[in-house]
UniProtKB/Swiss-Prot annotation:
Ranges for domain DOD-type homing endonuclease: 507-634, 1286-1426
SMART domains: HintC, HintN
The protein, known as: Uncharacterized protein MJ0832
SUPFAM superfamilies per record: Hedgehog/intein (Hint) domain (SSF51294), Homing endonucleases (SSF55608), PFL-like glycyl radical enzymes (SSF51998)
Claim: Nucleus is one of the keywords in the record: no
Post-translational modification remark: This protein undergoes a protein self splicing that involves a post-translational excision of the intervening region (intein) followed by peptide ligation.
PANTHER family: ANAEROBIC RIBONUCLEOSIDE-TRIPHOSPHATE REDUCTASE
InterPro entries, per database record: ATP-cone_dom, Hint_dom_C, Hint_dom_N, Hint_dom_sf, Homing_endonucl, INTEIN, Intein_C, Intein_endonuc_central
Biological processes per GO annotation: 2'-deoxyribonucleotide biosynthetic process; DNA replication; intein-mediated protein splicing
NCBIfam families per UniProt: intein_Cterm, intein_Nterm
Native organism: Methanocaldococcus jannaschii (strain ATCC 43067 / DSM 2661 / JAL-1 / JCM 10045 / NBRC 100440)
Organismal lineage: Archaea, Methanobacteriati, Methanobacteriota, Methanomada group, Methanococci
Amino acid sequence: MISAKDFAEKVMEFYVIKRDKRKEKFNVNKLAKSLINSGVNYGDLDTIISEVCAKVYNGITTDELKDIVYNVLKKIDKDVAENYRNGIILKVRTSEKEFESFDKEKIAKALIRETGADEETARKIADEVERELKKLKVKYLTAPMIREIVNYKLIEYGFEELRHKHTRLGMPVYDITKLIKSGSRENANLMYNPESIHKWVADETMKQYALLAIFPKHIADAHIKGDIHLHDLEYAATRPVCLQHDLRPFFKYGLKVDGTGLHTSVSKPAKHPEVAIQHAAKVMMAAQTNMSGGQSIDEFNVWLAPYVRGLSYEKIKQLMQMFIYELNQMYVARGGQSLGRDELIFIKEGDKLKVCKIGEAIDEFMEKYKDKIIVDGDTEILYLDGIAEVYTISVNVKTGKAEFKRVYAISRHKPRGKVYKVIGKDGTSIIVTEDHSLFNYDENGNLVCVKPRQMKHIIRNFNNPYDVEYRIGDYIETNYQRTDSKYNSRQNDIPEKLKITKELCQFLGLFVAEGSYITNGISITTKDDDIAKFIERFVKEQINENIAVKRYEDSVRFVNKGFYRFLKEHINGKAINKNSPEFILKGDKEMKLAFLGGLISGDGYVSKDGRVQIYTTSEQLLGQLHLLLSDLGMIYSITKIKEEGEKIEIKRNEIVRNYKLYVIEIAKNCTEDLKPYVIPKYKKERIKPANYDQLPYDYRIIKEHLRKITDKKPYNDYAWKSNNRKLKLNTLEKIEQLNPHLREEINKFKLNIPFEIKEIKEIDYNGYVYDLSVEDNENFITATGILCHNTIFSSINLELEIPEFLKDKPAVIAGTTRGTYGDYEEEAKLILEALVDVMMEGDAMGKPFLFPNFIIKLRENAFKDENKELMYKIHQLSAKFGIPYFINMLPDWQVTNTNAMGCRTRLSGNWTGDAEIDTLRTGNMQWYSLNLPRIAYEANGDDTKLFEILHERLEILKEALLIKHEVTKERLYVDNLMPFLTQEFDGESYYRYENTTKTFGFVGLNEMLKYHLGEELHESKDAVKFGEKVIEYIREYADKLKEETGLRWTVTQTPAESSLPYDEKILIFENNEYKLVKIGEFVEKYLNRYKDRAITYGDNNIEVYIKDENIYAPSFDKDGKIVLKPITHAIRHRGKEIYEIELESGKKVRVTGDHSVFTINDNLDVVEVKASDLKVGDFIITPKIIPSISKDKIYLSEIVKNKDKYYVKIKDHIKFIEEHEEILKESYKEYKTKWKDLKPVLKKKNAFRLDLIEDLVDKEKIEKISYGHANYINNKIKLDEKFGYLIGAFLSEGHWNDKCVEISSTNKEFIENLVEIIEEILGKDAYYITVKGDKRRYKDLYVIGLNKTVAMIFESLGLNKLSSNKEIPSILLSNETFLKGLIKGYIDGDGSIYVDESKRDYSIRLYTTSETLRDTLCLALKILGINYRLSIDKKSKVNENWRDCYVIKITGKENIEKLLDVEIKNNGGKDVIPKIAEKFKEIINQYSQREWKERFGIDVNNLHIWEDLKKGYMSRYRAKKVLNIMKNVKEIEEKYGRLLDKIGQLIDNDLLFERIKSIRVLDEIPEYVYDISVEGTENFIGGEGFICLHNTAGRFARLDYKYYKEETISVVRGDLNDVDSLYYTNSSHVRVDAPITLGEKVRIEEKFHPLCNGGHIMHIWNIESAADPEVLMDITKKITKTHIGFWTYTKNLSVCNRCGISMGGLRDRCINCGSEDVAKFSRITGYLQNISNWNRAKQKELEDRKLPRI
């Protein structure tokens, strides 16, 4: 610190008196430090200290000293003076959310530690940073902020390498904040971004880590510029790519899913084929988290062959079906099969069994272990190995018994398909995704998986997995220890061990039903004398005779500290958390009966006819009751569930239920056992014996199976004999008695009861769906016993025959060996045939299985007669679905064994010469790719230069691959991150890492040749030869590296992967709010923000990717429904001619001539049409409705957060003061009043400064709010109709200033209504009323004044003062109820209701001079689904200061009735649909009028079709009537069903059809025009009054277009006007639309397969027209005689989601049922996938693909 020598002696002996009267010596250094922390420059320090010290005197107080310093500082720098006065110093907020003083020493130390900087440099930078920070006017600093300034200084001083090492990983604070806010605040039903936040952040961070920390700068730069491509960057630091499995080690030694056996159970070697299948699937699942790419099981059918010997073909097929479903369900679990968030499940950690909502449980784990989450697509997966030992209740489907099984993984994702609610007649229900499997019985009595839509019944398991540990007469520890303290009353004693008696269990049940805790005691609510006597007797006899038991009017109470603590340890307090003690669940039958008896005595109901019901609001107790009742053999139904949010009336007050109430009804024939344990006599007497249950279940599904397996039949049983009667449990018991040997089989059925289904319905669902993965059984039950199945890129390599290298190898089975694999050739063939048959059948709806990839090895015997039938079947599968791949093992360059992945990576047995070592238990470590076209651009026609650049790029790839090799090796063997891979068998690691391939890939050979030679591969032999030369160079380079490094280097083919003017408004959805923005402002904002990622193309066109901003646009989907879709790009084009389109309704939009709007064509399809092609009288589409926002309240304290002068009143404020006293004391320091005097004032007045306490108190606790000293108003405001009315009234007749809000009107009724609403919402103190004379209208003018608090809050809400600028703030464009009230308030204020009975005209008009208010009123009406017309009343000719008045006119019966809650006659409001009258006419003309009358009873003249034909449209109302009439005629429905369905879809969609009034071309051409791109739908809403508008629409190709534009244009594929569609041809393939024969294609591509030893493939595209198995077999036979090594037949597929039919080609409509809900599939790189997920480049390539001539 600086010393002030001139003053040191003078002030050294001075004392300063502190506020607590203590004396402290004046310290110049201390003064200097506080000045520096306040921001004083070092140069001014001496001057300030000198002046202050000159004024200091002995005995000065701290306040006086502070005033002196402040006055001195004020003359130099007012901001610094304020910092000093307010105690603002440089503070740093740490990651732990604590604050600490800034310390530049930490910067210096960090630089030395992280970057290796020398001390002098580090301190120099630290000093510079401190100087910069002093200049900042911020409340606090953050570590990232300081780090960025340090980096800036490092660059300034030329320390680039140090800056590189010091860079912070992650995304900008703004971006992460946006993502988190969207994730936590946005309503899920408003289409929250389907990409996972965790996935986005994790991938971006790991990619940055790879480019900054793994790879040196020159490699990272080469990737970023597009010279090379580093694939899988997000996994560069953690894992290899792919793996070929060998199942033998697991069949011999067993399976450790975690690789160690420490965190999961260890499975013994599989003895049974079912277990072997499960182990095969689990091997894939266990390794998946260790690989970034795919996995394959080589020789799959060979390894499994020994397990199926002696089995029938049907059994083998069933096993293969099980395997395929296992793989697909595991795969889908990472993205498809899941349960709704609120489904109740059992979770056991330690000894505690909890019942919890699956979503809450998984979210809690995910939040706790977020750094361990793995993201696969949009599915988040958390493997629990090494994290937590979690169990759930699962069912062994063989025995039917419930077991505790370990949960090894949990997952969640947003649903991509439909969500169903399955409701049983027993009252249970479950919400599942369309692909989630539940269980049903099949006809053989097996519990099998079925999807929701195929369910015949709901299986509920009634079995308790607990073993009996406690019995009546045992003792249980109370943990009570008596003390000899004189204060210990005898009545507090209880035994140290409490005897378990019937009465104890009854009391526990009674307490769970009606008990609560009081201070050190128990209260049981009851008026029943029997219960009161029972409690007194139990307490005196079994707890302590000295306890005083007191009876009150409605309760019985006693105090005993020991028993109170015992109960608290076992039972929760509140009703919604009540539970059964754990020892009851583990108790014997009598304990459970007694507990239930007590429960029924309290919270049960026994009807006069003997029905017994139990009521509970506790989800925990619901699940435990399921286990208790199950153990007692008592089945039950849930007769009623009172839903959360339901309104109930208590003492004439209506309140909302904030919990569910479950009503459990026990089967009548089970209740008699409970009778001795029920306490009240009247309940006990009502329980009567019954020999029947009343529950809706039925075992008829297994009746035939039972008839087959029973020796002795229960012939005297009516249900057994009759096919119509339900088969019940009593019949099963008779069968069991007659056939004791079937006891286990019958017991399985008794424990798993098939309840009838009441309904399966599709529901709207918000948010994530969830799943568990459970060891062994792969299933779990819900809290009511419903049995659920739980839910990897995979391939299998298959043999038609046992290969030579395996024939003599011992065949492994069940931990030993039996013969050799050569002995099992027939079994291997049967497995292959069964797999083909299963894949051919598809799933339950006939859809193809996407996994595993199906790879057939063709050896020399493939086409022999004995294989002919099987080969035909395989090609049938190719013809039907295009699934199989083929490896050609016949060329000379293929060796003993070769295997492949569907993505083309390949292993061959030529590394060590041992086929097993070279091709099994190893795979591709990584491939990185060359951009070949760019090398050609840079070589500019010079061969020598081309190969020089090629060599340089290969050197870069080599270095990158060597780095990845060492990093992965360290992760495997040093960090032990992948124990499954490194587990040892016979002394050798399972994963043979040293045998993995390091691979050079390449993209765009065809385009390289086109640029370099001027010819493509298919155009000349010279091009092919030069292409071979290039790939040979890469191969020779790789072979040379093998010798140099001793590593395995290979080469592989790599797969390549109109507008509006500036001020036109569009509608967007951001941060859970609708906003109307000018498209130009919107686009320019993001073009400026992301200049570095913007792409320029064509004639000054520029676009930028903004999907990560999480901004949405309302948009219509293929069904005509308005949905919210992400905006992916902001786009700017060079200006063009602008067309202004005005509709008859007054709505307008301005677009360029080539920008499209929407209409319908003669086929009733919605199509786009360019503005320049429109004409007056055409119909275009506008939205009928816009989705509402589920926001039902606001908190005013949140609206004014971070603003001063607001005061609040807090609930339980005295408790709040006590809890936060130290922080409050510090916060209120600036007050002159001392804390000890201020504290009682706060306690008395309950008035806290909001800005001082807002971070300490939850918004729910703030009851009132005030600005300054104005009157308080309510803090929580419901967004209901009344508050909407108030806002509407203000918008129409109100204004505000700095002192108040005023709403005035001459309408007394309007004012009175408003006063009533204000009192209810804001409180009686919020307003005043005055009456003024209105001279203009000779009426009293009533003025409501709202206090200053309301005025300030209106300002914060965005409610403008001036009528010309008013608008509905975005935050208030929310739910329909609020908006309906707003419109009503506006109508009563500044609207009018127009009635003309003679013309049947009934309309509403809203008036405003504000354009923004007009637009937001229109938006509010759209959210309400109300249509309108727009017009303008021109400003007064008398007074030019008057503004134009905008008029919104609402007509239409449905609109007005909806808005005003009135009933009116139809007034012909226009809601019409063009074109459909013509379609109805076509149907009518098929019959004469007489036929219509006589055959169908329809007078067609009454349909008024001819009138509609003249008009060119038909009203929606009439169209619906005509449609219903026609659909009710069976013949018409059968003949024209599809057409009528299409008409119905148009009638029921969210679109309006409005006629064009005028089109004009504007004189002025703007400099720029703008557009946005919307994901999936490619349309958005904009213009005055809202109109639906269309939007315009490989990495290497796009980057080359950016950096080598002219060169790229000459060779690139795709649409130059759509930069995202640009692509290069995959690797060494000929281009997809080359005009050549298949033979020519083979002859070109076969040249490259032997050279690409790390992977290759030939695609035969679009085989739909040649999908004949015989033709494909013939092609296959011919290809095996060439050098093509690996190929597949790709068939484009369309699968109907309604009826399940699969169709060849990419179709928009099902050829079977006419549905347009069609999924389209094709092959990308190597996998069949839904093309909707493809990027534009791949979709463009798909458009270009052609089948070569055969």
